[in-house]
Amino acid sequence: MIVTPLKHSGIHLSSGTLQRRNMPLDAVFIDSIPSGTLTPLKDLVKYQKSSLKVNGHKKNQLLEIRTSNNKDLFQSTMLSEATLPNSSLDISVIKPSMDRLRNEMIYESPGKIFQRMKAKVQRDKQEQLTRSSSMLGSPQGEHTKDFPPNTDKKAQLQQTYICEEKQTSVQSNDPSLGDPPILNQEQKNVSASCISKKALTRAQFGGQVLHSKESPVRITVSKKNTFVLGGIDCTYEKFENTDVNTISSLCVPIKNHSQSITSDNDVTTERTAKEDITEPNEEMMSRRTILQDPIKNTSKIKRSSPRPNLTLSGRSQRKCTKLETVVKEVKKYQAVHLQEWMIKVINNNTAICVEGKLVDMTDVYWHSNVIIERIKHNELRTLSGNIYILKGLIDSVSMKEAGYPCYLTRKFMFGFPHNWKEHIDKFLEQLRAEKKNKTRQETARVQEKQKSKKKDAEDKETYVLQKASITYDLNDNSLERTEVPTDPLNSLEQPTSGKERRHPLLSQKRAYVLITPLRNKKLIEQRCIDYSLSIEGISDFFKAKHQEESDSDIHGTPSSTSKSQETFEHRVGFEGNTKEDCNECDIITARHIQIPCPKSKQMLTNDFMKKNKLPSKLQKTENQIGVSQYCRSSSHLSSEENEVEIKSRTRARNTKERLNRERENTNHITKDILLISETEGERACYITPKRPRSCYITPKRPRSSAKESHYKSAVSKDFLTEGKASDRTSRQLLDHLPGLTDDEEWSEQELQKLHCAFTSLPKHKPGFWSDVAMAVGSRTADECQKKYTEEPQGQGSRKHGSKKKQANKVQNGEKDSADAKTIKITAKVGTLKRKRQMRDCLEHLAKDNHDDFFTATPLQKQRIQLPSFQYSQDDDFLLDMDRDPASPSSIITSPLRSTTPQCQHFSPSMLAAIERNNCDRYVYQMQKNAKKYGKSNGGLVWGNIRKKTVKTDLSSPPPTRKALFNKDLGKNTDISKYFIDDTESDEEEKDYYFSNSD
């Protein structure tokens, strides 16, 4: 049994009409259309009148139509002995315009209607295929709205959905009814139409129209198919065993807007939903109602399994189909297929997941939950229970970009292996350990920074310029010095030592003069004016020599800083002392009053002292100045000389101790340079009382004794020897000290090493000048290259000339200095001695005396040194034949091939010095022998020079092929006479190959 609602404006039917507005049309029944014809929609109007007369003239029609004044009418149809079609067709549903009257007919073009029909059929077929074959699901959803034309009454709609189910045959309980014959079935499409005065709508689904000759009151339900009535709630519950037994029923429309179901047998129903269709914001209730037909017999209804009702709101009712679709999709996507997948670490390096692209959807990335189980190499189960299927290989490029190691990618290249947990646990443990190490390193870095800041603050406090702490106790009346005992060890204590200052007793407290450092000239002048002091030599004192400091001097010598720190030595002499006081000599230490230098130099000094970490005693010793205090009268001028001598001895002793301590640290070469600069830069001023309550300031020149100069020279010599004997590290230190090696002249030994290394080492190899510098030992590569390119012509002559000069000095017993006078040419012309004198004279000429065109050219420093190509065994054999052409037989049989060494581009004899004496003597003998050959004898030519014959044991190899000749052939024939040598004549003996005429 199927009950269909009418199509009415404001009421939507099945899913096919969910997005369309329904317009009332006149119904055209399928019986009015001739069978076997395809009638267009525009021709269906012809059959409207005939379809209205079907109830009056045809008895085989099972439909009864009654019109009334009510606007809502329903059409009931009884189906039996047939199955429902796969899809129900809604034909020609046209959207009405709200501005016009509802009873006005509006037509669409047939082409659009046909396309809409076709699309709907295809869509319904696809939905039917996805459903279960045993039951029919509910429609997808129903979007309902109410558009009341004149009244505010709610339209009530009772919908019933059909579920097909097999059952056994049931015999009728009514004895008056016989067994009617089985009705014939015919499946046809029914077009929907609507007939009413204003807006009467009837909808008729495609079904089966039953034709029978007898009365339509008696209908026998077949054994095959029965239908169970159910509401919307049935789609969300599983059907149980339900039996529907029906003998005869009749459905007719009633005026009370509902349907009545009459039956003679017990009918078991699921439930029918009665919905109140209202505005979208109003709630729509569903309840089960079964109305009995008052005309026919009452039906007995039994509910076998009652179920609770569901209350659905308007929004939830709209989204019923969406919810059903989502549930199906969730069940469907429990097995997710991923391609181009990779492994990702999650949950703070404690678990992994897989991420990749979905196979069903393009360019959509999807990542899983925590992987807990391996089903197959490409199937995994997650913590949520879903199954992920991996397609293809792992995305190694993404894994590498994400920073995962290569071995992990290789292990999981084709999927998850059996021991995947071991690899993952090992990798995660490694990641956690690295994270802990990074955290520890960052914590240690922060602590080191804090410690360094504290140390810097302490060092700044330590090296801050301190105020002078020397006090002088003066008597107001006699202006005589009262001796205050001073401990030199206590005076050397730093103010940051934490010890309290020992204050003198109350009886010893007198007026004190505090000498504090003054930062500039104006302050000194102002202070002297305030205390009635005379000023002398301040302008000379403030002319500090500031040297430029480069970035490479960070490790180096703050000599300019030490020079700019001027040192005052305070000496206060008093008159009126007895001679007994002169015998007493107390050496007290006074702190220096330091004039501050620029901030950059102060920072350089502080950094240098931090790095070198000089002992505190050494720093204190540098600040000590021995001051001998003698009590003398106003006329004691001679005592100043003794005081100067004592001070110089004290300073020399302090310098000696400082040098001895610094020589122990041979790794720090810069300390020696610092000491030299500090010793040279010390300057001091004395404040000497000239009159009572007045004194003057005189600048003191830097004084250095013989011992100091001796130590300075020793320091410089030690520094040079260390620089020459050191390796690359010492050369790097020398590179950071500009002005030390660049200004020094090259010694003869260094020049000789330079030229020997240049000629012996291969020039085409990279790092040639570095190898030359290694051979020289005391120069860098840049210095060697610069020296060789600056003086290219005079190097060889200087080297050989110096050797020749030394040899001549040894032979003649002369001991001349380096600045010898110009050699005089005393020998006769044409002698060997004159030749040597001329050579020596030319070698000792100054370079400024003559101009060299090649040295003056601007391209002199841009000369390109061509590499000397060395023969390699990998060269082509044709080139080898060109270098040393030889026949194959000579190569095999020559005994010298194995004994003669292969000659390179130089030989060891070439590296030795050239013996000028032997060469000159040889050339001189050649010239002397040339006189023997006059023009009559042909002169001096190469043919006349006697050569020594070289005896070799070379023997010609035996011929490889012997020609067989007949022995009698030479005797019997005249061939042998052609091979007889001609006899030599006497005339040819006088003729020579070389003639004088040439």
From Swiss-Prot:
UniProt keyword list: Cell cycle, Cell division, Centromere, Chromosome, DNA-binding, Isopeptide bond, Mitosis, Nucleus, Phosphoprotein, Ubl conjugation
Bias kind Acidic residues: ranges: 981-990
Residue list for modification Phosphothreonine: 516, 578, 688
Domain SANTA, chain residue ranges per copy: 336-422
Name of a matching Pfam family: SANTA
Modified residues (Phosphoserine): 9, 109, 134, 169, 258, 638-639, 726, 872, 955, 985
Record's compositionally biased regions (Basic and acidic residues): 142-153, 644-660, 812-821
GO cellular component: CENP-A recruiting complex; chromosome, centromeric region
Example GO molecular function: DNA binding
Region (Disordered): 122-153, 438-460, 476-502, 638-660, 784-821, 976-998
GO biological process: cell division
Protein name: Mis18-binding protein 1
